[in-house]
Amino acid sequence: MDKAQQDALKKAAGIEAAKLVENGMIAGLGTGSTVKFLVDELGRRHQEEGLEFTGVTTSRRTQVQAESYGIKIVDIDDVDHIDVTIDGADEVDKNFNGIKGGGAALLWEKIVATNSNQIVWIVDESKVVDTIGKFPLPVEVIPFGAGQVIKKFEARGYKPVLRLDADGKEVRTDENNFVVDLHLERIDHPQELAEDLINTVGVVEHGLFLNMVDKVIVGDPNGPRVMTNANK
């Protein structure tokens, strides 16, 4: 699948997901290439159809995009609930376990998700896998002592790599932390790994989102299809 085909599937999933946002809602808006299409469609509906809703974003770049359409964006602490959060995912399996954080927004994404009544992910079909872990698992760590955390990960066989930008500088999250990507190839026991990571001093959050999502909208060549989590 080339990039144009992949983008077409992402766009279709984003347009389908935008239908979930209705007048008067408070909607969490995620981060990433698929969410960009979602925000474009919500912006179109706001400007052309008069859709009025309040957004809570998981990154500053999504906030800038949404506000460019005139969408009202507020801080998460200025709302008492979030009706639905729509976000992308880097991988998702049949048990609705996912990896997120390829865009370095995993902490804000998880905070918004855990305060939402409903969580929806939008992905293209390449992101649906049998076992998560092929995509590197992002872990957000504070800069102080990050090298020590990386050494611990190396000792555990996690194959950590500090994420750098095109200029060779450390990628910084919106909270000014570092991102360490774990090249695990496959994750057979995600819950155990999640507990190990979050209990490591210096780790702020990890990109494992386990059985959190209610619905996954998959961009498919035959049209968007919906995976519904029966355990939620």
From Swiss-Prot:
Cellular component per GO, a single term: cytosol
Positions annotated as active site in the UniProt record: 109 (proton acceptor)
Assembly notes: Homodimer.
Gene3D superfamilies the record matches: 3.30.70.260, 3.40.50.1360
PANTHER family: RIBOSE-5-PHOSPHATE ISOMERASE (PTHR11934:SF0)
BP terms from Gene Ontology: D-ribose metabolic process; pentose-phosphate shunt, non-oxidative branch
Residues annotated for substrate binding in this entry: 31-34, 87-90, 100-103, 127
Record key words, sorted: Isomerase
Gene Ontology molecular functions: ribose-5-phosphate isomerase activity
Functional summary from the UniProt entry: Catalyzes the reversible conversion of ribose-5-phosphate to ribulose 5-phosphate.
InterPro entries, per database record: NagB/RpiA_transferase-like, Ribose5P_isomerase_typA_subgr, Ribose5P_isomerase_type_A
The protein's name: Ribose-5-phosphate isomerase A
The keyword Membrane is annotated on this UniProt entry: no
Classification via SUPFAM superfamilies: D-ribose-5-phosphate isomerase (RpiA), lid domain, NagB/RpiA/CoA transferase-like
The family this protein is said to belong to: Belongs to the ribose 5-phosphate isomerase family.
Metabolic or biological pathway, per its Swiss-Prot or TrEMBL entry: Carbohydrate degradation; pentose phosphate pathway; D-ribose 5-phosphate from D-ribulose 5-phosphate (non-oxidative stage): step 1/1
Isomerase is among the record's keywords: yes
Species assigned in the record: Bifidobacterium longum (strain DJO10A)
